[in-house]
């Protein structure tokens, strides 16, 4: 027996919220690793990235399947399209976290990375998601 559409949307809401929290943690870890010059933290961010991206892609596919299966209209259609768009935005934020880590791992210079703009970027991103 197929699930009700509302149950599927609620399940996707919970998943996207958990993924958003995980991405924020990863971004904060990346900024912390960059500012403290700890390459092991940046390696952890890159390691976690694969799992996060897989979860985002599976959620996006699940949304597309629900779109095809239930053929929603109006409000329900907007809900699904919003979830698909959020997956894309969260993926971009995760890519930024990984790029920050790659910058540290590929840099050959040790300089003061305690940049207030990097920390501000992380806090603004966190505010946007929450």
UniProtKB/Swiss-Prot annotation:
Protein known as: Uncharacterized protein MJ1011
Species the sequence originates in: Methanocaldococcus jannaschii (strain ATCC 43067 / DSM 2661 / JAL-1 / JCM 10045 / NBRC 100440) (Methanococcus jannaschii)
């Amino acid at each position: 027996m197929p699930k009700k559409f509302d149950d599927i949307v609620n399940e996707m809401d919970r998943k996207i919220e958990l993924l958003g929290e995980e991405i924020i943690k990863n971004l904060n870890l990346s900024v912390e690793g960059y500012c403290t010059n700890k390459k092991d933290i940046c390696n952890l961010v890159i390691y976690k990235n694969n799992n996060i991206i897989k979860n985002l892609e599976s959620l996006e596919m699940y949304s597309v399947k629900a779109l095809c299966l239930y053929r929603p209209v109006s409000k329900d259609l907007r809900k699904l399209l919003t979830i698909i768009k959020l997956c894309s935005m969260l993926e971009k934020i995760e890519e930024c976290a990984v790029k920050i880590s790659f910058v540290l791992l590929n840099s050959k210079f040790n300089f003061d990375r305690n940049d207030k703009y990097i920390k501000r970027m992380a806090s603004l991103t966190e505010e946007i998601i929450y």
